[in-house]
Amino acid sequence: QKGSIGMVLAKSHQLLEKRYPQSKISWVEFPAGPQMLEALNVGSIDLGSTGDIPPIFAQAAGADLVYVSVEPPKPKAEVILVAENSPIKTVADLKGHKVAFQKGSSSHNLLLRALRQAGLKFTDIQPTYLTPADARAAFQQGNVDAWAIWDPYYSAALLQGGVRVLKDGTDLNQTGSFYLAARPYAEKNGAFIQGVLATFSEADALTRSQREQSIALLAKTMGLPAPVIASYLDHRPPTTIKPVNAEVAALQQQTADLFYENRLVPKKVDIRQRIWQPTQLEGKQL
């Protein structure tokens, strides 16, 4: 996805191609997590990065995908936006209004948690399910009253002007993005997966050690203005990819339960069944 900084930089610098010259590396971009996990489930791709919600929907639908790692949370990189002159001043004011977001995305979770914090239910708003590009158009045209979205779309809207941040992810206790793979692939390629993820962490570190060069490269690759990329980097913490520990798994379980309670997923899921842990042997093979 456009927001996967480490992956985009790794691709731009051909880090995986250099690390694994005998392997054929293919890169595929998706507009959002749900579409990516569909491709992962049918074997079109081997590894993908997505927000916290798409894996829950995929698991509920029976996809045999596993969480192989997680990034730290980025609470400042995901927001609910309203027009600058909107009468909506608080999340509670969203009651009865149209809110655009990608169904089954991390922004879906941001919205649900923000509503709960404000004493509202999901049924108190008018959800409008749209892809980021379509949501942006609907928001700009005034066809929806608010837009829950992640970076870099958020930074692009912010710098274009005429918007106000109603709420970001601060104090909403979300996880960071996850990396997922099909279970059979993960079980057979553990060492390779670990090496790939380590490469992504190295690539992400370039946003700090080579900030200006990285901004220029990301702007060119993503087709976005450099100020948008700079804003996005300012919204995110250093991103080192780590295994999914018990605390993260428990937080993701809380999220899954929240979506089930709101009848947004058809059945309960057990996140612990989908956590993949590299073995010591696989670690030594690196």
Regions found by a protein language model. Give the residues of each.
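Extracytoplasmic "Venus flytrap"
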Residues: Q1-H13
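Pocket-lining segment of extracytoplasmic ligand-binding domains
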Residues: I53, D124-T128, P132-K220
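Secondary-structure end/capping motifs
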Residues: E187-P266
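Conserved C-terminal helix/tail region of periplasmic/extracytoplasmic solute-binding proteins
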Residues: D257-L286
